[in-house]
Amino acid sequence: MKDDLDFQVLLPDEIDTIQMIANWYFDEWQIPIEKTFLKLKSITLDDSQFQVIATHGGQPVATGGVYHRVGLLEKEPRFAIHQHWLGLVYTIPELRHQGIGAELCSQIEVNAKNRGINEIYLFSDTAVSLYNRLGWIEVELVVFGHRTVTVMKKEI
């Protein structure tokens, strides 16, 4: 499956795809659709932030991006010194556990490096073992709302 994937950076005029991602993020994490829509529109106009789409057979199946602002920074502003955050890595439910998320992360890293980004951070409570396998280093455990998340970093 992962050998049949294509990857592309989201462009500002891909309104239908932006809307689809906003719907995915609402369904998965209850992030308001309008908030995601506006965020994705704005980052597509900024070379230092981006969103990658994975497609299979021409159909979007996964997405994630590199952002300056992530939810953790609202509760823990001390992490704002780190400018690039991998976030909102999502694979459609029926294709999870097939290596798509790992391949997507690799493609995001390639795009980041090509943009001159040398270090990326993330936070997670559900996929720490995946990120460890992908070479990420655990930095700190942080209480974030009702859960404890692991802040991680990777030099690329």
Predicted features by range, described:
Residues 53, 59-75, 85-90:
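Conserved beta-strand in the GNAT
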Residues 88-91, 97-110, 133:
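Conserved acetyl-CoA-binding loop-helix of GNAT-fold acetyltransferases
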